[in-house]
């Protein structure tokens, strides 16, 4: 069973955004399969453009032969005039026993990310940082992982590698 939604617009104010992200504080054993497309997503007053998410559940064998649910992120995409972001990945149980923060529920998010920037200055302005960069194009790609749900970016456990290739811009 897949939860599907096609929306022309979705506007989540800051208070609503916090409520959405707090849903993952008591992390479920499985997330629903999703097929969501939003023509215009606004998050905390910031227009993020077109949003698409396709994700499903699967059973996967873990270390020691245990079978557990993994939430597969097949498509995560944001498209705006200045840039396009896409990612694939999974939210899966941590492979080995380790001392983990309580809020992570022994699950880890893994993402392969790709950001194509057409106008870095305009992109930074969109995210509230005007006057930092003029123009600039390029890409950022790599792998990221953190303890906890995809909606709970946990910076203390963040790991990964990113490649940045930017050109034709000027720091102001």
For every predicted segment, state its role:
Residues 16-28:
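Surface-exposed beta-loop interaction hotspot
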């Amino acid at each position: 069973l897949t939860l599907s939604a096609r929306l022309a617009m979705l506007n989540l104010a800051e208070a609503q955004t916090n409520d959405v992200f707090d849903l993952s504080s008591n992390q479920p054993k499985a997330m629903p399969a999703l097929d969501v497309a939003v023509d215009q997503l606004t998050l905390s007053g910031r227009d993020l453009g077109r949003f698409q998410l396709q994700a499903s559940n699967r059973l996967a064998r873990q270390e020691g032969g245990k079978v557990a649910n993994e939430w597969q992120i097949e498509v995560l995409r944001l498209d705006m005039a200045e840039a396009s972001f896409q990612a694939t990945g999974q939210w899966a149980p941590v492979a080995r026993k380790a001392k983990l923060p309580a809020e992570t529920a022994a699950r880890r998010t893994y993402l392969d990310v790709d950001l194509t920037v057409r106008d870095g200055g305009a992109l930074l302005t969109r995210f509230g940082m005007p006057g930092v960069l003029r123009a600039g194009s390029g890409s950022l790609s790599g792998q990221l992982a953190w303890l906890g749900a995809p909606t709970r970016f946990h910076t203390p456990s963040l790991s990964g590698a990113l490649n940045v290739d930017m050109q034709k811009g000027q720091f102001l």
